[in-house]
């Protein structure tokens, strides 16, 4: 029985019957907590969960940081050594293996189906908030609902939102459904006023995303796995209250997007049968694929729908060929000092003396040193091979729109 039924019971059939429902609900909840506790893992001041009887466990990448080996303790009190199997720094996920004696198994919670979650479903978060488990040797359980699915929150691009209370120390712990299955790994909270404590919004990496990455994590030999992206295409998003869509604005020749058959003007309808309603959803879906994945894009072209299959590859950093002038004080935006001959910047039409006023459709409205610093960092860290990068430059008294194809 569910908590919702007990609440409805109080309204419809009287206090006595509602009390019976509530008692059943409490028993169900207690049984789930009893089942989940032994599979919980205390690790590095944070949380984790065993998902297989052979001792494979999950936590957040930010919990393990750059360490390779750990002393961990299960919720049943037993302690083990654990070593990192694989890391996904972008997706904030890590897999570790407990060092078990030959033939020994440990309690575990299986992965569930996060795609079956509905807004309003009950959810339970298990964790070690504020390291309280150090005091009483037991994890804590908080109960809430699924507040949203397919949400984008920073690097969590397809996450689950819950109002089950999460606090520092809950990171890496499981979000479980009423069947006692792991539907997510908790990892972020929404904070206010600089206070790192629960505000009613917690974010979990979905079991769907975990299932996509688990085989790669197990094969990583302690290393890091890479995310993929669709290269050679520029999307344009119209996210408004009444109309939302994602269209292809430009496709670069000779790229994987061009080989897949994308055309300017295509509207993205779905990616691998997952509906794309807006730009956030499109970016979220594309953000969870591993390197080398193939994805089916359903696009609307004219009056018909066409399915395109594209290969997604890991980003490769590149040099744009742009050198910036040093800041000289005053209210200066980034100024191009030199353009490398034969570079992507020269092909795009950039010239010495150009003032960068917009990057990827956004005006550089910052104080002078901040604008230059942020733009310089973006040049070095966010532009990859086959990216189409819109730039607006001021040349004399005229603003010029340029498109840089990174090579």
Residue locations for each model-derived region?
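N-terminal activation segment of mature serine protease catalytic domains
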Residues: 21-60, 67-69, 73, 81-83, ...
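C-terminal cap/linker of serine protease catalytic domains
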Residues: 23-33, 104, 129-132, 182-239, ...
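Gly/Ser-enriched beta-turn/beta-hairpin loop segments
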Residues: 35, 89-91, 135-138, 148-160, ...
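Active-site loop architecture of trypsin-fold serine endopeptidases
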Residues: 47, 67-70, 103-106, 126-143, ...
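PDZ domains, with a preference for the canonical peptide-binding region formed by the helix
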Residues: 65, 71, 258, 270-298, ...
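Conserved catalytic-core segment of clan PA serine endopeptidases
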Residues: 70-102, 110-115
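PDZ/PDZ-like groove recognition
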Residues: 165, 216-270, 274-281, 305-358, ...
């Amino acid at each position: 029985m569910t908590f919702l039924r007990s609440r409805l019971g109080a309204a419809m059939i009287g206090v006595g019957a509602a009390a019976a429902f509530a008692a059943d609900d409490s028993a169900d909840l207690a049984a789930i907590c009893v089942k989940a506790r032994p599979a919980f893992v205390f690790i590095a001041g944070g949380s984790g969960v065993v998902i297989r009887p052979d001792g494979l466990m999950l936590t957040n990448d930010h919990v393990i940081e750059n360490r390779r080996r750990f002393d961990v303790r299960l919720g049943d009190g037993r302690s083990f050594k654990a070593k990192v199997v694989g890391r996904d720094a972008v997706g904030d996920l890590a897999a570790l293996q407990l060092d078990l004696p030959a033939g020994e198994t440990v309690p575990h919670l299986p992965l569930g189906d996060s795609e079956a979650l509905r807004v309003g479903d009950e959810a339970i978060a298990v964790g070690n908030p504020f390291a309280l488990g150090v005091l009483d040797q037991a994890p804590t359980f908080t109960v809430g609902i699924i507040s949203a699915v397919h949400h984008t929150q920073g690097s969590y691009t397809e996450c689950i939102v819950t109002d089950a209370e999460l606090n520092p120390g809950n990171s890496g712990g499981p979000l479980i459904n009423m069947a006692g299955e792991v539907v997510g790994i908790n990892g972020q909270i929404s904070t206010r006023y600089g206070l790192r404590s629960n505000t009613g919004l917690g974010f979990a990496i979905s079991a769907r995303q975990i299932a996509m990455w688990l085989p790669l994590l197990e094969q990583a030999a302690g290393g890091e796995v890479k995310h993929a992206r669709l290269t050679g295409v520029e999307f344009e998003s119209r996210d408004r209250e009444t109309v939302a869509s994602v269209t292809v604005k430009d496709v670069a020749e000779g790229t994987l997007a061009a080989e897949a058959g994308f055309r300017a003007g295509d509207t993205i309808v779905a990616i691998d049968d997952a509906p794309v309603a807006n730009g956030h959803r499109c970016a979220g879906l594309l953000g969870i694929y591993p390197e080398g994945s193939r994805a089916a894009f359903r696009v609307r072209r004219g009056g018909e729908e066409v399915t395109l299959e594209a290969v997604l590859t890991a980003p490769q950093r590149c040099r744009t060929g742009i050198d910036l002038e040093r800041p000289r004080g005053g209210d200066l935006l980034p100024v191009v000092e030199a353009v490398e001959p034969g570079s992507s910047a020269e092909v795009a039409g950039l010239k010495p003396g150009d003032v960068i006023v917009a990057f990827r459709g956004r005006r550089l409205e910052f104080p002078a040193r901040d604008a230059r610093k942020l733009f310089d960092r973006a040049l070095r860290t966010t532009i990859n091979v086959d990216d189409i990068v819109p730039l607006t430059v001021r040349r004399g008294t005229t603003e010029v729109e340029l498109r840089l194809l990174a090579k």
